[in-house]
Design a protein with these regions (language model features):
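Sec-dependent signal peptide cleavage junction
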Residues: 1-60
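Structural microenvironment flanking redox-active thiols in thiol-disulfide oxidoreductases
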Residues: 100-141, 151-162
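Extracytoplasmic
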Residues: 61-63, 81-83, 114, 170
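Thiol/disulfide oxidoreductase modules built on the thioredoxin-like
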Residues: 139-141, 150-202
Length: 205
């Protein structure tokens, strides 16, 4: 069994919405352009937990790094969340199943953030930061929302995660559970009830 198949610890269903794929030429041109993004604020640090009681499992895949912006323009990479258990969810403001998951993520964050849980919602193809912020405020989202610095970074990050795990990038929501050592230990293609996330998260806290 290949590594891509083995993170079939992957759960999949039809409770997804297809995401449009940007043209590769546009992504390539933005990739070189974004190397010199101006006016970046310093990468922010999140509070870190030093627990190391992560269950050991075979064929874990290292989570790809990323460089994305929060809704205030602060730049984050994956190391900003080092030492925490991360639920990284790719979603869209236009996606019905994604919206249904938000209340469960809010509850999870409230309950487990003090134990080292960080929830990161990467908004894909969801318009400007201002539009996403209005959406976030309306739903009272309390966890970290990240999006493009300039253009296409969010989709490129989605592509990186979909590629290393083999789940693809054609549909949202897609969520990845990352342990304290930075390995992807579970993936979910499609919306899930909160009870599934609670069950799977607990052993890693």
């Amino acid at each position: 069994m290949s590594k891509k198949q083995s993170v079939a610890n992957t759960e999949a269903d039809n409770n997804v919405v297809k995401a449009k794929v940007p043209k590769s030429r546009k992504i390539a041109s933005q990739r070189s352009k974004n190397k010199n993004v101006k006016n970046r604020k310093p990468i922010q640090s999140k509070k870190q937990k030093n627990k190391t009681n992560t269950p050991k499992s075979l064929d874990k895949i290292k989570a790809p790094d990323f460089l994305l912006s929060d809704l205030e323009g602060n730049i984050f990479d994956l190391s900003a969340f080092s030492g925490q258990v991360i639920m990284l969810t790719f979603w869209g403001t236009w996606c019905g199943p994604c919206r249904r998951e938000i209340p469960d993520f809010i509850k999870l964050y409230d309950e487990y953030n003090d134990e080292g849980l960080e929830i990161i919602g990467v908004a894909v193809q969801s318009g400007t930061s201002e539009n996403i912020k209005r959406f976030s405020d309306y739903y009272k989202i309390n966890y970290t929302i990240l999006t493009d610095i300039d253009r296409y970074e969010s989709y490129r990050t989605f592509h990186d995660y979909g590629t290393v795990t083999g789940v693809g990038t054609r549909a949202v929501p897609t969520t990845f559970l990352i342990d304290r050592d930075g390995y992807i230990v579970k993936t979910y293609r499609g919306a899930r009830p909160g009870s599934v996330f609670y069950r799977d998260l607990k052993p890693y806290l």
